[in-house]
Amino acid sequence: DRWYVARHRAVTWDEQEQEWWDMSVKAILDNVTAQHRVFVHRDFMLRNFMVTPEGLAVLDFQDALFGPVSYDIASLLRDAFISWNESFVLDMTIRYWEKARKVGIPIPTDFSEFYRDVEFMGLQRHLKVAGIFARLNYRDGKPKYLADTPRFIEYIRHTARRYIALSPLQHLIDNLEGSEAQVGYAF
């Protein structure tokens, strides 16, 4: 929240808003840390794929580590640089979930639970990226990344509106960015 909220938006949260932030972070961390740990790429997005004569190659894997089972699918379908239609995201997540279950990847047996995990993981990534992109602009003089922030701020807003545990985050984002009409799937 230091780079995006304080620096980019020039906002200092009051005590209530800080409490909302702390509640939101706790809800996200509780979800993410409860997930099974598997080997994850950590930067699994279209920009890191290359088609070769032998098949698909994955680039930029030096940061791979053990992390939440939803990390890579959240990275791919909640890309900071590409917007996917929500029905496409649901379809791809269902396909991933079905195949992962068949090969024994430790994911929830209930799809709605897995989708929630994917959304919370995507939310954590986008909150982090908002701060990183603001930092790249203000500290490193790289303003081009800020052009992509509306996309993942919208991801954050959309996900926060879907889950009661994230309603404090919804209020923070609406206060920070202005409010919008609610549209989308609910679980």
What are these regions (language model features)?
Residues 2-8, 69-106, 120-140, 152-159:
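Active-site activation/catalytic loop segments of kinase-like enzymes and analogous catalytic loops
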Residues 107-116:
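Histidine/acidic-rich helix-loop-helix segments that form or flank divalent-metal centers
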Residues 131-187:
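ATP/Mg2+ or Mg2+-diphosphate-binding catalytic cores
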Residues 16, 84, 118, 140, ...:
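A structural signal for alpha-helical segments
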Residues 44:
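Hydrophobic HxD+1 residue recognition
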Residues 8-13, 36, 102-108, 140-143, ...:
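Surface-exposed helix-capping loop/turn segments at secondary-structure junctions
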Residues 1-41, 50-53, 57-59, 67, ...:
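ATP-dependent phospho-/nucleotidyl transfer catalytic cores
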